[in-house]
């Protein structure tokens, strides 16, 4: 009897201990997914016929309640519960990649402002097969931060059906029945031996430009270059001469009450003057721009004119816009703070850079910073007197005539 009482007491103690463990046990941590589609509808069951129980929009955080092979049962922040397709969501790891991308490039200088041509996704890295998350609407404004170029993913070639092989016709006088009884696993010998021709030349891969961009919500990601349009004033677009303007920056403004330019029926009196950077309409280039042009406003003729132009260079963004005094020359003009701009070009001693095979970034080794000051209708380079002009690289080799003309310009 005493042994039975002791066993009963031990059982009660163990039961109490287990109850205590359950009391102090922490609640299982929630799992989350994020909506990648523009909008999804929650359903009450996974079936061909179902009822809507709620909606969720792009980027919204959902709590995972249950899971099947292709669907997830979730709860929205508003308490709506239902099933969604798993392919329309991203996991926490993908969301963390985009958060880290935005934090890393939060203070990067803005190269240009662009708009989305259509509904398009932001990717975690350059490339069509990389993870995607945020979905942009047509016309969304973006700030471009960095360019990368990667090979385009080619679609898988369609299988080509081989035509049925026809047996060779029997020679004159040969046994017709013998030719017809040729075994199926034996092919007639070719009359001429097959000779291997010269090795086929493999064409270079087709490249695509991707831009790291940030939208108005602070969300960052990579977007395909051909899906955006750089914001350029209409008054400058006609001066592009078949080139693509990759950056247009306001140097300063001039007053012209008789400009003739209208905005909503009103005359624009404050006319901006620009420095622009242009490049060919081609992806995969080892530079961001190969031409620089400064447009100033002619107050007498009320139109834009070119005050400075440089071409055949390997230039890299971003550019720097500001004001400065001339530190090398005396006089009242030199002491005035006038508009200035700086940009970087590849040095002649540096190799032409190739895109990084992993990141797609183009990282030149040696760059030359060129600074100019706008003095009226003249752009003057800020270079200390007696300093030799550094030699620059060129996409197209200069002709002797161009070198001689540049030499005369330097001596002046």
Protein language model regions, located:
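Boundary regions of SH3-family modules and the immediately adjacent low-complexity/disordered segments
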Residues: 22-37, 58-63, 75-114, 125-127, ...
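Long, low-complexity, intrinsically disordered segments
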Residues: 399-412
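Post-signal-peptide N-terminal segment of Sec-exported extracytoplasmic proteins
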Residues: 33-73
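Bacterial N-terminal signal peptides that target proteins for export
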Residues: 1-9
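Short, charged beta-turn/beta-strand-edge "cap" motif at the junction between a beta-strand
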Residues: 67-70, 147-151
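Short alpha-helix capping/helix-loop boundary micro-motifs
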Residues: 46-51, 121-131
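Short beta-strand elements that form the blades of beta-propeller/WD-repeat-like
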Residues: 271-285, 329-349, 399
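C-terminal motif of bacterial Sec signal peptides marking the signal peptidase cleavage site
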Residues: 16-20
């Amino acid at each position: 009897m005493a042994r039975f009482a002791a066993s009963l007491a031990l059982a009660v103690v163990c039961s109490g201990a287990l109850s205590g463990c359950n009391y102090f046990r922490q609640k299982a941590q929630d799992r989350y997914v994020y909506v990648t589609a523009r909008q999804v509808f929650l359903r009450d069951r996974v079936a061909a016929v179902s009822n809507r129980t709620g909606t969720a929009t792009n980027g919204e955080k959902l709590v995972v309640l249950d899971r099947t092979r292709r669907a997830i049962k979730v709860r929205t922040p508003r308490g709506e519960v239902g099933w969604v397709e798993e392919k329309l969501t991203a996991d926490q790891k993908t969301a963390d990649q985009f958060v880290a991308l935005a934090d890393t490039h939060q203070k990067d200088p803005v190269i240009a402002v662009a708009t989305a041509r259509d509904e398009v996704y932001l990717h975690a890295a350059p490339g069509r097969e990389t993870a995607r998350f945020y979905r942009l609407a047509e016309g969304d404004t973006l700030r471009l931060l960095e360019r990368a170029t990667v090979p385009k993913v080619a679609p898988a070639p369609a299988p080509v059906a081989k035509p049925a092989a026809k047996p060779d016709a029997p020679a004159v006088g040969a046994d017709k029945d013998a030719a017809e009884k040729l075994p199926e696993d034996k092919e007639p010998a070719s009359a001429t031996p097959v000779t291997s021709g010269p090795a086929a030349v493999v064409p270079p891969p087709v490249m695509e430009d991707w831009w790291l961009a940030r939208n108005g919500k602070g969300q960052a990601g990579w977007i395909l270059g051909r899906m955006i349009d750089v914001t350029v004033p209409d008054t400058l677009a006609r001066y592009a001469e078949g080139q693509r303007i990759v950056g247009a920056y306001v140097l300063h403004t001039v007053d012209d009450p008789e400009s003739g330019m209208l905005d909503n029926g009103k005359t624009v009196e404050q006319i901006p003057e620009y420095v622009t950077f242009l490049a060919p309409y081609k992806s995969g280039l080892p530079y961001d721009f190969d031409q620089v042009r400064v447009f100033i406003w002619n107050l007498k003729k009320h139109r834009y004119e070119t005050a400075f132009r440089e071409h055949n260079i390997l230039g890299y963004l971003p550019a720097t816009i500001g004001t400065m005094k001339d530190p090398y020359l005396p006089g009242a003009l030199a002491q005035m703070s006038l508009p200035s701009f700086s940009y970087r070009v590849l040095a002649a001693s540096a190799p032409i850079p190739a895109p990084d095979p992993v990141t797609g970034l183009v990282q030149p080794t040696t760059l030359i910073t060129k600074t100019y000051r706008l003095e009226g209708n003249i752009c003057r380079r800020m270079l200390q007197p007696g300093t030799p002009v550094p030699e620059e690289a060129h996409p197209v080799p200069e002709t002797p005539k161009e070198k001689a003309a540049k030499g005369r310009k330097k001596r002046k």
